[in-house]
Regions:
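Bacterial N-terminal signal peptides
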Residues: 10-19
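An alpha-helical repeat/solenoid feature that recognizes helix-turn-helix modules
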Residues: 26-37, 45-86, 100-238, 245-367, ...
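Bacterial N-terminal signal peptides that target proteins for export
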Residues: 1-10
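A short, hydrophobic C-terminal helix/tail in secreted or cell-surface proteins
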Residues: 410-428
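Sec/Tat signal peptide C-region and signal peptidase I cleavage site
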Residues: 21-25
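Short, charged juxtamembrane terminal tails flanking transmembrane helices
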Residues: 430-433
Length: 433
Protein backbone atom coordinates (compact mmCIF):
# COMPACT_ATOMS: atom_id res chain seq x y z
CA UNK A 1 0.00 0.00 0.00
CA UNK A 2 1.03 3.61 -0.67
CA UNK A 3 1.04 4.80 2.96
CA UNK A 4 1.43 8.47 2.03
CA UNK A 5 -1.64 8.42 -0.20
CA UNK A 6 -3.60 6.34 2.29
CA UNK A 7 -2.81 8.82 5.05
CA UNK A 8 -3.87 11.73 2.84
CA UNK A 9 -7.14 9.99 2.04
CA UNK A 10 -7.75 9.33 5.72
CA UNK A 11 -7.07 12.96 6.57
CA UNK A 12 -9.52 14.09 3.90
CA UNK A 13 -12.15 11.70 5.22
CA UNK A 14 -11.58 12.99 8.73
CA UNK A 15 -12.18 16.58 7.59
CA UNK A 16 -15.31 15.58 5.72
CA UNK A 17 -16.72 13.78 8.74
CA UNK A 18 -15.89 16.64 11.06
CA UNK A 19 -17.93 18.95 8.85
CA UNK A 20 -20.94 16.61 8.82
CA UNK A 21 -22.98 17.32 11.90
CA UNK A 22 -25.93 15.00 11.41
CA UNK A 23 -26.14 11.94 13.67
CA UNK A 24 -27.04 8.64 12.10
CA UNK A 25 -30.37 8.11 13.82
CA UNK A 26 -31.97 7.12 17.13
CA UNK A 27 -30.48 8.30 20.36
CA UNK A 28 -26.74 7.84 20.27
CA UNK A 29 -26.45 8.37 24.02
CA UNK A 30 -28.76 5.41 24.59
CA UNK A 31 -26.72 3.20 22.30
CA UNK A 32 -23.49 4.25 23.99
CA UNK A 33 -24.94 3.58 27.44
CA UNK A 34 -26.17 0.15 26.37
CA UNK A 35 -22.77 -0.73 24.93
CA UNK A 36 -20.95 0.45 28.06
CA UNK A 37 -23.32 -1.44 30.33
CA UNK A 38 -23.02 -4.57 28.20
CA UNK A 39 -19.23 -4.52 28.21
CA UNK A 40 -19.16 -3.98 31.97
CA UNK A 41 -21.45 -7.00 32.40
CA UNK A 42 -19.20 -9.10 30.19
CA UNK A 43 -16.10 -8.04 32.11
CA UNK A 44 -17.76 -8.96 35.39
CA UNK A 45 -18.70 -12.44 34.21
CA UNK A 46 -15.36 -13.46 32.66
CA UNK A 47 -13.92 -16.57 34.29
CA UNK A 48 -10.52 -16.59 35.95
CA UNK A 49 -9.08 -18.55 33.01
CA UNK A 50 -10.12 -15.78 30.62
CA UNK A 51 -13.15 -17.53 29.15
CA UNK A 52 -16.89 -17.24 28.92
CA UNK A 53 -18.59 -20.60 28.54
CA UNK A 54 -22.38 -20.35 28.72
CA UNK A 55 -23.00 -22.23 25.47
CA UNK A 56 -20.74 -25.14 26.37
CA UNK A 57 -18.38 -24.17 23.55
CA UNK A 58 -16.05 -21.96 25.51
CA UNK A 59 -13.95 -20.76 22.60
CA UNK A 60 -17.10 -19.61 20.79
CA UNK A 61 -18.43 -17.55 23.71
CA UNK A 62 -14.98 -16.18 24.42
CA UNK A 63 -14.36 -15.21 20.81
CA UNK A 64 -17.74 -13.47 20.60
CA UNK A 65 -16.91 -11.45 23.71
CA UNK A 66 -13.40 -10.70 22.48
CA UNK A 67 -14.80 -9.30 19.23
CA UNK A 68 -17.21 -7.09 21.18
CA UNK A 69 -14.42 -5.61 23.32
CA UNK A 70 -12.12 -5.24 20.33
CA UNK A 71 -14.57 -3.55 17.99
CA UNK A 72 -15.64 -1.06 20.64
CA UNK A 73 -12.01 -0.21 21.37
CA UNK A 74 -11.65 0.99 17.77
CA UNK A 75 -14.74 3.22 17.90
CA UNK A 76 -14.53 6.95 18.64
CA UNK A 77 -14.60 7.13 22.43
CA UNK A 78 -13.45 3.52 22.71
CA UNK A 79 -14.06 2.00 26.12
CA UNK A 80 -14.67 5.37 27.72
CA UNK A 81 -13.33 5.54 31.27
CA UNK A 82 -12.99 1.75 31.52
CA UNK A 83 -9.86 -0.23 30.73
CA UNK A 84 -10.56 -3.71 29.39
CA UNK A 85 -7.02 -4.43 28.24
CA UNK A 86 -6.62 -7.26 30.75
CA UNK A 87 -9.94 -8.78 29.71
CA UNK A 88 -8.79 -8.78 26.09
CA UNK A 89 -5.42 -10.32 26.96
CA UNK A 90 -6.97 -13.03 29.11
CA UNK A 91 -9.62 -13.89 26.51
CA UNK A 92 -7.04 -14.02 23.75
CA UNK A 93 -4.73 -16.25 25.77
CA UNK A 94 -7.61 -18.63 26.49
CA UNK A 95 -8.45 -18.91 22.80
CA UNK A 96 -4.82 -19.50 21.83
CA UNK A 97 -4.36 -22.12 24.55
CA UNK A 98 -7.47 -23.89 23.26
CA UNK A 99 -6.27 -24.14 19.65
CA UNK A 100 -5.68 -27.55 18.07
CA UNK A 101 -4.04 -28.39 14.77
CA UNK A 102 -4.91 -30.63 11.85
CA UNK A 103 -2.84 -31.69 8.86
CA UNK A 104 -3.29 -29.68 5.66
CA UNK A 105 -2.20 -31.33 2.39
CA UNK A 106 -0.92 -29.63 -0.75
CA UNK A 107 -3.81 -31.15 -2.72
CA UNK A 108 -7.16 -31.36 -1.01
CA UNK A 109 -8.36 -33.96 -3.51
CA UNK A 110 -9.54 -31.85 -6.42
CA UNK A 111 -6.22 -30.36 -7.49
CA UNK A 112 -6.55 -27.24 -5.34
CA UNK A 113 -3.87 -26.44 -2.76
CA UNK A 114 -5.21 -25.26 0.63
CA UNK A 115 -1.73 -25.22 2.22
CA UNK A 116 -1.24 -21.52 1.52
CA UNK A 117 1.58 -20.93 3.99
CA UNK A 118 3.36 -24.21 3.35
CA UNK A 119 3.29 -25.07 7.07
CA UNK A 120 1.17 -28.18 6.54
CA UNK A 121 -1.07 -27.40 9.50
CA UNK A 122 -4.41 -25.76 10.11
CA UNK A 123 -5.80 -24.40 13.36
CA UNK A 124 -9.18 -25.50 14.63
CA UNK A 125 -11.44 -25.02 17.66
CA UNK A 126 -14.67 -26.61 18.87
CA UNK A 127 -14.51 -30.38 18.47
CA UNK A 128 -17.59 -31.72 16.70
CA UNK A 129 -18.91 -28.19 16.11
CA UNK A 130 -15.59 -26.98 14.75
CA UNK A 131 -16.95 -25.07 11.76
CA UNK A 132 -19.19 -22.91 13.93
CA UNK A 133 -16.62 -22.34 16.66
CA UNK A 134 -13.62 -21.73 14.40
CA UNK A 135 -15.78 -19.36 12.36
CA UNK A 136 -16.36 -17.32 15.52
CA UNK A 137 -12.71 -17.39 16.55
CA UNK A 138 -11.26 -16.22 13.24
CA UNK A 139 -12.88 -12.72 13.19
CA UNK A 140 -11.76 -12.09 16.77
CA UNK A 141 -8.17 -13.07 15.98
CA UNK A 142 -8.22 -10.96 12.84
CA UNK A 143 -9.48 -7.83 14.56
CA UNK A 144 -7.17 -7.86 17.58
CA UNK A 145 -4.23 -7.56 15.19
CA UNK A 146 -5.37 -4.09 14.10
CA UNK A 147 -3.86 -2.54 17.21
CA UNK A 148 -5.64 -3.58 20.42
CA UNK A 149 -3.04 -3.86 23.20
CA UNK A 150 -0.40 -3.03 20.57
CA UNK A 151 -0.92 -6.25 18.62
CA UNK A 152 -0.28 -6.56 14.89
CA UNK A 153 -0.14 -9.44 12.38
CA UNK A 154 3.63 -9.64 12.93
CA UNK A 155 3.42 -9.87 16.72
CA UNK A 156 4.95 -13.14 17.91
CA UNK A 157 2.74 -15.17 20.23
CA UNK A 158 4.33 -16.27 23.49
CA UNK A 159 3.49 -17.54 26.94
CA UNK A 160 0.26 -19.39 26.15
CA UNK A 161 1.63 -22.83 26.98
CA UNK A 162 0.39 -24.13 23.61
CA UNK A 163 3.45 -25.17 21.62
CA UNK A 164 1.50 -25.09 18.36
CA UNK A 165 1.03 -21.30 18.56
CA UNK A 166 3.88 -20.03 20.75
CA UNK A 167 6.67 -18.67 18.56
CA UNK A 168 4.39 -18.04 15.59
CA UNK A 169 2.94 -14.68 14.58
CA UNK A 170 -0.75 -13.81 14.72
CA UNK A 171 -0.71 -13.49 10.95
CA UNK A 172 0.59 -17.05 10.61
CA UNK A 173 -2.09 -18.44 12.91
CA UNK A 174 -4.79 -16.55 11.01
CA UNK A 175 -3.46 -17.78 7.66
CA UNK A 176 -3.38 -21.38 8.82
CA UNK A 177 -6.91 -21.10 10.18
CA UNK A 178 -7.99 -20.03 6.70
CA UNK A 179 -6.27 -23.20 5.49
CA UNK A 180 -8.55 -25.27 7.73
CA UNK A 181 -11.61 -23.89 5.96
CA UNK A 182 -10.04 -24.09 2.51
CA UNK A 183 -9.16 -27.74 3.03
CA UNK A 184 -12.45 -28.63 4.73
CA UNK A 185 -14.77 -27.21 2.07
CA UNK A 186 -17.02 -29.87 0.56
CA UNK A 187 -15.78 -30.87 -2.87
CA UNK A 188 -17.45 -32.43 -5.88
CA UNK A 189 -15.58 -35.69 -5.26
CA UNK A 190 -16.51 -36.07 -1.57
CA UNK A 191 -19.97 -34.44 -1.46
CA UNK A 192 -22.57 -36.57 0.33
CA UNK A 193 -25.07 -35.34 -2.28
CA UNK A 194 -24.40 -33.28 -5.41
CA UNK A 195 -25.87 -30.07 -4.03
CA UNK A 196 -23.52 -30.07 -1.03
CA UNK A 197 -20.54 -29.04 -3.15
CA UNK A 198 -18.89 -25.82 -2.03
CA UNK A 199 -20.28 -25.52 1.49
CA UNK A 200 -19.40 -26.69 5.00
CA UNK A 201 -21.13 -28.49 7.84
CA UNK A 202 -20.26 -29.10 11.47
CA UNK A 203 -16.75 -30.42 10.95
CA UNK A 204 -14.63 -29.29 7.99
CA UNK A 205 -14.13 -32.04 5.46
CA UNK A 206 -17.13 -34.19 6.40
CA UNK A 207 -18.53 -34.01 2.85
CA UNK A 208 -21.74 -32.30 3.92
CA UNK A 209 -23.08 -28.74 3.94
CA UNK A 210 -25.90 -26.82 5.58
CA UNK A 211 -27.33 -23.34 5.25
CA UNK A 212 -26.67 -22.36 8.85
CA UNK A 213 -23.07 -23.52 9.15
CA UNK A 214 -21.81 -22.29 5.79
CA UNK A 215 -21.93 -18.64 6.86
CA UNK A 216 -19.24 -19.13 9.52
CA UNK A 217 -16.27 -19.95 7.29
CA UNK A 218 -17.41 -17.10 5.01
CA UNK A 219 -17.55 -14.50 7.79
CA UNK A 220 -14.29 -15.76 9.27
CA UNK A 221 -12.47 -15.46 5.97
CA UNK A 222 -14.03 -12.05 5.25
CA UNK A 223 -12.32 -10.77 8.39
CA UNK A 224 -9.14 -12.76 7.78
CA UNK A 225 -8.58 -11.50 4.23
CA UNK A 226 -8.61 -7.93 5.56
CA UNK A 227 -5.48 -8.71 7.61
CA UNK A 228 -2.33 -7.57 5.78
CA UNK A 229 -0.44 -10.58 4.45
CA UNK A 230 -3.30 -13.08 4.74
CA UNK A 231 -4.58 -14.76 1.58
CA UNK A 232 -7.84 -16.57 0.89
CA UNK A 233 -7.53 -18.86 -2.15
CA UNK A 234 -9.77 -17.88 -5.05
CA UNK A 235 -10.92 -21.47 -5.48
CA UNK A 236 -12.72 -21.34 -2.12
CA UNK A 237 -14.94 -18.50 -3.31
CA UNK A 238 -15.48 -20.07 -6.71
CA UNK A 239 -16.54 -23.40 -5.20
CA UNK A 240 -18.84 -21.70 -2.68
CA UNK A 241 -20.92 -20.34 -5.56
CA UNK A 242 -22.16 -23.86 -6.27
CA UNK A 243 -23.53 -24.18 -2.75
CA UNK A 244 -25.10 -20.72 -2.85
CA UNK A 245 -26.96 -21.49 -6.06
CA UNK A 246 -28.19 -24.82 -4.70
CA UNK A 247 -29.38 -23.89 -1.21
CA UNK A 248 -31.47 -20.78 -1.97
CA UNK A 249 -35.20 -21.32 -2.33
CA UNK A 250 -36.96 -19.63 -5.29
CA UNK A 251 -38.75 -17.44 -2.69
CA UNK A 252 -35.40 -15.88 -1.76
CA UNK A 253 -34.98 -17.66 1.56
CA UNK A 254 -32.37 -20.28 2.38
CA UNK A 255 -32.86 -23.86 3.48
CA UNK A 256 -30.89 -26.17 5.72
CA UNK A 257 -29.58 -29.08 3.63
CA UNK A 258 -31.95 -28.56 0.71
CA UNK A 259 -33.56 -25.39 -0.65
CA UNK A 260 -36.96 -26.43 0.74
CA UNK A 261 -35.99 -27.64 4.22
CA UNK A 262 -36.30 -25.35 7.24
CA UNK A 263 -36.12 -22.11 5.26
CA UNK A 264 -35.74 -19.18 7.65
CA UNK A 265 -34.37 -15.73 8.38
CA UNK A 266 -31.03 -16.57 9.97
CA UNK A 267 -29.86 -18.79 7.13
CA UNK A 268 -30.92 -16.13 4.63
CA UNK A 269 -28.77 -13.57 6.42
CA UNK A 270 -25.95 -16.09 6.22
CA UNK A 271 -26.33 -16.32 2.45
CA UNK A 272 -25.88 -12.55 2.20
CA UNK A 273 -22.59 -12.91 4.09
CA UNK A 274 -21.54 -15.40 1.44
CA UNK A 275 -22.46 -12.97 -1.34
CA UNK A 276 -20.21 -10.37 0.30
CA UNK A 277 -17.40 -12.91 0.66
CA UNK A 278 -17.56 -14.25 -2.89
CA UNK A 279 -18.66 -11.12 -4.72
CA UNK A 280 -21.30 -13.33 -6.33
CA UNK A 281 -24.92 -12.18 -6.21
CA UNK A 282 -26.42 -15.43 -7.47
CA UNK A 283 -28.57 -15.97 -10.52
CA UNK A 284 -32.26 -16.39 -11.24
CA UNK A 285 -33.67 -18.98 -13.62
CA UNK A 286 -36.62 -16.93 -14.79
CA UNK A 287 -39.77 -15.04 -13.71
CA UNK A 288 -40.88 -15.91 -10.19
CA UNK A 289 -37.43 -17.08 -9.12
CA UNK A 290 -35.86 -14.85 -6.47
CA UNK A 291 -32.72 -16.93 -6.03
CA UNK A 292 -30.21 -14.10 -5.79
CA UNK A 293 -29.04 -11.38 -3.43
CA UNK A 294 -32.04 -9.15 -4.12
CA UNK A 295 -34.37 -12.08 -3.49
CA UNK A 296 -32.74 -12.81 -0.13
CA UNK A 297 -33.13 -9.19 0.95
CA UNK A 298 -36.77 -9.16 -0.15
CA UNK A 299 -37.35 -12.37 1.84
CA UNK A 300 -35.94 -10.69 4.96
CA UNK A 301 -37.92 -7.51 4.42
CA UNK A 302 -41.19 -9.44 4.18
CA UNK A 303 -40.45 -11.23 7.48
CA UNK A 304 -38.61 -8.41 9.21
CA UNK A 305 -40.96 -8.02 12.19
CA UNK A 306 -41.08 -11.74 13.04
CA UNK A 307 -40.25 -12.56 16.65
CA UNK A 308 -38.02 -15.45 17.70
CA UNK A 309 -39.87 -18.74 17.44
CA UNK A 310 -39.41 -22.49 16.95
CA UNK A 311 -35.77 -22.40 18.16
CA UNK A 312 -34.20 -21.36 14.84
CA UNK A 313 -36.80 -19.09 13.27
CA UNK A 314 -37.70 -15.41 13.51
CA UNK A 315 -35.75 -12.18 13.82
CA UNK A 316 -36.28 -9.81 16.76
CA UNK A 317 -35.30 -11.35 20.08
CA UNK A 318 -33.26 -14.09 18.37
CA UNK A 319 -29.55 -13.31 18.89
CA UNK A 320 -28.33 -15.85 16.35
CA UNK A 321 -30.71 -14.61 13.67
CA UNK A 322 -30.15 -10.92 14.40
CA UNK A 323 -26.36 -11.28 14.22
CA UNK A 324 -26.62 -13.35 11.05
CA UNK A 325 -28.95 -10.83 9.42
CA UNK A 326 -26.88 -7.88 10.65
CA UNK A 327 -23.72 -9.34 9.10
CA UNK A 328 -25.52 -10.02 5.85
CA UNK A 329 -27.18 -6.63 5.50
CA UNK A 330 -24.24 -4.56 6.74
CA UNK A 331 -21.93 -6.25 4.26
CA UNK A 332 -24.30 -5.87 1.30
CA UNK A 333 -26.54 -2.80 1.62
CA UNK A 334 -24.92 -0.95 4.53
CA UNK A 335 -26.54 0.38 7.69
CA UNK A 336 -28.90 2.72 5.87
CA UNK A 337 -29.90 0.46 2.99
CA UNK A 338 -33.44 1.33 1.93
CA UNK A 339 -34.20 -2.22 0.76
CA UNK A 340 -35.47 -2.99 4.28
CA UNK A 341 -38.56 -0.89 4.91
CA UNK A 342 -41.00 -3.14 6.81
CA UNK A 343 -39.93 -1.77 10.19
CA UNK A 344 -40.85 -2.99 13.66
CA UNK A 345 -41.30 0.53 15.03
CA UNK A 346 -44.01 2.77 13.65
CA UNK A 347 -42.98 6.40 13.00
CA UNK A 348 -44.51 7.69 16.23
CA UNK A 349 -42.56 5.16 18.31
CA UNK A 350 -39.13 5.83 16.82
CA UNK A 351 -36.58 7.45 19.10
CA UNK A 352 -34.31 9.87 17.26
CA UNK A 353 -31.74 12.52 18.07
CA UNK A 354 -33.07 14.55 15.16
CA UNK A 355 -36.64 14.18 13.85
CA UNK A 356 -35.27 14.68 10.34
CA UNK A 357 -33.08 11.56 10.53
CA UNK A 358 -34.16 8.84 8.13
CA UNK A 359 -35.07 5.57 9.83
CA UNK A 360 -33.33 2.39 8.71
CA UNK A 361 -33.06 -1.28 9.60
CA UNK A 362 -30.06 -0.73 11.88
CA UNK A 363 -31.95 1.89 13.90
CA UNK A 364 -34.86 -0.55 14.15
CA UNK A 365 -32.49 -3.16 15.56
CA UNK A 366 -30.73 -0.67 17.84
CA UNK A 367 -33.88 0.67 19.44
CA UNK A 368 -35.08 -2.86 20.13
CA UNK A 369 -31.77 -3.82 21.75
CA UNK A 370 -31.69 -0.69 23.90
CA UNK A 371 -35.25 -1.31 25.08
CA UNK A 372 -34.75 -5.01 25.87
CA UNK A 373 -31.44 -4.79 27.73
CA UNK A 374 -31.59 -5.84 31.37
CA UNK A 375 -30.62 -3.46 34.16
CA UNK A 376 -27.37 -5.35 34.78
CA UNK A 377 -26.24 -4.89 31.16
CA UNK A 378 -27.14 -8.37 29.91
CA UNK A 379 -29.87 -9.52 27.53
CA UNK A 380 -32.14 -12.51 28.03
CA UNK A 381 -31.32 -14.02 24.65
CA UNK A 382 -33.24 -16.97 23.28
CA UNK A 383 -32.94 -20.76 23.25
CA UNK A 384 -29.24 -21.71 22.90
CA UNK A 385 -28.05 -18.10 22.55
CA UNK A 386 -28.03 -16.44 25.97
CA UNK A 387 -25.47 -14.96 28.33
CA UNK A 388 -22.19 -13.78 26.87
CA UNK A 389 -23.04 -14.93 23.37
CA UNK A 390 -26.21 -12.83 23.21
CA UNK A 391 -24.62 -9.81 24.89
CA UNK A 392 -21.57 -9.86 22.63
CA UNK A 393 -23.52 -10.06 19.39
CA UNK A 394 -25.94 -7.37 20.55
CA UNK A 395 -23.05 -5.06 21.43
CA UNK A 396 -21.53 -5.59 18.00
CA UNK A 397 -24.85 -4.65 16.39
CA UNK A 398 -25.20 -1.54 18.54
CA UNK A 399 -21.69 -0.31 17.83
CA UNK A 400 -22.18 -0.85 14.09
CA UNK A 401 -19.38 -3.35 13.66
CA UNK A 402 -18.18 -3.08 10.08
CA UNK A 403 -17.90 -6.32 8.15
CA UNK A 404 -14.77 -6.10 5.97
CA UNK A 405 -15.29 -6.07 2.22
CA UNK A 406 -11.96 -7.72 1.49
CA UNK A 407 -10.38 -4.72 -0.21
CA UNK A 408 -6.96 -3.40 0.77
CA UNK A 409 -6.97 -1.89 4.25
CA UNK A 410 -4.79 0.75 5.89
CA UNK A 411 -2.00 -0.34 8.20
CA UNK A 412 -2.76 -0.13 11.93
CA UNK A 413 -0.77 3.11 12.19
CA UNK A 414 -2.96 4.78 9.58
CA UNK A 415 -6.07 3.53 11.31
CA UNK A 416 -4.79 5.00 14.56
CA UNK A 417 -4.33 8.37 12.83
CA UNK A 418 -7.92 8.26 11.63
CA UNK A 419 -9.16 7.31 15.08
CA UNK A 420 -7.32 10.27 16.59
CA UNK A 421 -8.89 12.61 14.05
CA UNK A 422 -12.35 11.31 14.90
CA UNK A 423 -11.91 11.26 18.66
CA UNK A 424 -14.59 13.88 19.18
CA UNK A 425 -17.20 12.18 17.05
CA UNK A 426 -18.59 9.81 19.64
CA UNK A 427 -21.98 9.66 17.94
CA UNK A 428 -20.65 8.67 14.51
CA UNK A 429 -20.35 4.99 13.72
CA UNK A 430 -20.24 4.25 10.03
CA UNK A 431 -20.99 6.11 6.86
CA UNK A 432 -24.25 5.23 5.15
CA UNK A 433 -23.79 2.77 2.30
Amino acid sequence: MDTKNATACMAALTCALLSAGTALGSTEAQKDAAISSGLAWLAGTQAANGSWCGSGYCAADTAAALLAFTEQRYKPGGWGAADYSANVTNALNFILRDASTIAIPNNRGDGNNPNISGSGIGYIWGGGEATYVTGLVLPALARVTAGVNGLSPTTVISGTGNASVDGRTYGQVIQDTVATFANGQTRADNAAWPGARGGWRYYPGDGQSDGSTAQWPAIGMLFAQAVPGVTVPAFVKNELRSWMDYIQNPNGGVGYDSPTSLVNESKTGGLLVQTAFTGYAGSVSGPGDDSDRAGAIAFLNARWTNAANSTWDGNFGHPYAMWSIYKGLESTIGLSGAEISNFLYAPAARIKDDPADVWNWWEDYSQYLVETQNADGSWDGYSYWTGAMAASWNINILNATEIPDGSDVPEPGTLALLAAGLAGLGSLRRRPA
